[in-house]
């Protein structure tokens, strides 16, 4: 009985067979080709701009800034977002092709920052408008923190399923596609909260005993050091 003889492999050739799935291949191809749309409105964006220099060189991560949302798959929001800017931000996010990601950079973007204490025009968190993948706290965050956030985003991309991500985002849409904001009655009366303002004490609130005690003479030995 003759055995089937297989041709011997050349010892100088290397194995060139890769076993993977289409989803893993798609995730791997997007790890080093994130094209961000830079949405900077205040001082946090200055820290991100330092990444372009030769010291940090964010080109080594495959980041290519784009000016059009139709060519970007990552939007990086840095700074305060106001109510008037909210529809524009949502429109930019809707124009980005799937799959798309969001990094919220800085305290003003995540919570509204110090401007949301008594302001009627500040959005208290960009996640109320668009879904956020990575939160980057700080005021402002350092460039090293931005690189760490990009690394965490790449790890998240490497183990995700695109179909499940698309379905979950469609269920958590904050705005409709038509970008129509519902008109509500304004709760701003033009006056600030009086409890937050400093009010000088009136002379009527000071008791007469306290006033008389302050008028009493001070002994001479207490004036000597």
Swiss-Prot record:
Listed InterPro entries: NADH_UbQ_OxRdtase-like_20kDa (IPR006137), NADH_UQ_OxRdtase_20Kd_su (IPR006138)
Binding sites annotated in the UniProt record for [4Fe-4S] cluster: 43-44, 108, 139
Key word NAD present: yes
GO cellular component, one term: chloroplast thylakoid membrane
Protein's UniProt keywords contain Ribonucleoprotein: no
Reactions listed under catalytic activity: a plastoquinone + NADH + (n+1) H(+)(in) = a plastoquinol + NAD(+) + n H(+)(out); a plastoquinone + NADPH + (n+1) H(+)(in) = a plastoquinol + NADP(+) + n H(+)(out)
Source organism superkingdom: Eukaryota
Keywords: 4Fe-4S, Chloroplast, Iron, Iron-sulfur, Membrane, Metal-binding, NAD, NADP, Plastid, Plastoquinone, Quinone, Thylakoid, Translocase, Transport
Subcellular location: Plastid, Chloroplast thylakoid membrane
SUPFAM superfamilies to which the protein is assigned, alphabetical: HydA/Nqo6-like
A GO term for molecular function: 4 iron, 4 sulfur cluster binding
Cofactor names: [4Fe-4S] cluster
Cofactor: binding details: Binds 1 [4Fe-4S] cluster.
UniProt cross-references to PANTHER family, sorted A to Z: NADH DEHYDROGENASE (PTHR11995), NADH DEHYDROGENASE [UBIQUINONE] IRON-SULFUR PROTEIN 7, MITOCHONDRIAL (PTHR11995:SF14)
Function: NDH shuttles electrons from NAD(P)H:plastoquinone, via FMN and iron-sulfur (Fe-S) centers, to quinones in the photosynthetic chain and possibly in a chloroplast respiratory chain. The immediate electron acceptor for the enzyme in this species is believed to be plastoquinone. Couples the redox reaction to proton translocation, and thus conserves the redox energy in a proton gradient.
Name under which the protein is recorded: NAD(P)H-quinone oxidoreductase subunit K, chloroplastic
Protein species of origin: Hordeum vulgare (Barley)
């Amino acid at each position: 009985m003759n055995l089937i003889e297989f041709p011997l492999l050349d010892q100088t050739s290397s194995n060139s067979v890769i076993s993977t799935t289409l989803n893993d291949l798609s995730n791997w191809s997007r790890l080093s080709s994130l094209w961000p749309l830079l949405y900077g409105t205040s001082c946090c964006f200055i820290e991100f701009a330092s990444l372009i220099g030769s010291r940090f060189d964010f080109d080594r991560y495959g980041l290519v800034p784009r000016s059009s949302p139709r060519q970007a798959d990552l939007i990086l929001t840095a700074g305060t977002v106001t109510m008037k800017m909210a529809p524009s931000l949502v429109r930019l996010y809707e124009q980005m092709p799937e799959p798309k990601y969001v990094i919220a950079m800085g305290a003003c973007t995540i919570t509204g920052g110090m401007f949301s204490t008594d302001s009627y025009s500040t959005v208290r968190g960009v996640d109320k408008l668009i879904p956020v993948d990575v939160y980057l706290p700080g005021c402002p965050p350092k460039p090293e923190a931005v690189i760490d956030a990009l690394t965490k985003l790449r790890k998240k991309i490497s183990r995700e399923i695109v179909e499940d991500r698309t379905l979950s985002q469609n269920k958590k849409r904050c705005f409709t596609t038509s970008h129509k904001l519902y008109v509500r009655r304004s709760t701003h009366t033009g006056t600030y909260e009086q409890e937050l303002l400093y009010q000088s004490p009136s002379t009527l609130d000071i008791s007469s005993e306290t006033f008389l005690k302050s008028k009493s003479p001070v002994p001479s030995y207490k004036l000597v050091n």
